[in-house]
Amino acid sequence: QFPPYQGGGGMIEEVKKETITFAPSPNKFEAGTMQTAEVVAFKESLNFIEKLGVDKIYNHENQVLEYGLDKIKKNNSVTVIGNPKERGSIISFTIKGIHPHDIATILDEEGIAIRAGHHCCQIYHEILGTPATARASLGIYNTKEDMDALSAGIEKCKKVFKI
């Protein structure tokens, strides 16, 4: 009995000048083209995780994370944000005197992908007293060499901003 929340192909049974008849559920809620590629990719992702093993993935991410944190924390201009025991495989940080969006831009030029911004937690950033943070999210595909590149990228940021 709920009306559809969006329009698109496959969700309409009949259209007349004065009325529209929607397809029966669930089709009236599945407008547009089905995300076939995403469904296939999801299946393959699950196969990959199952083959590799969650413990192996967790241990690898932790090793890379600890290596990266050790390198980054040695830099006096960098503040690492967050509780070390609850961080997961994420490094959120700021560099004194450089806006996180500038950090992200410079790192991007070096081929390093991070995010910068509030990360959907503006209140936390208000509490921290920072307009935003830079965030490196690690996964099974990251290596210690990636952390070396991140550390070198941070040094480049400092050089560009003469810090």
Regions found by a protein language model. Give the residues of each.
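Pyridoxal 5′-phosphate
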Residues: 1-163
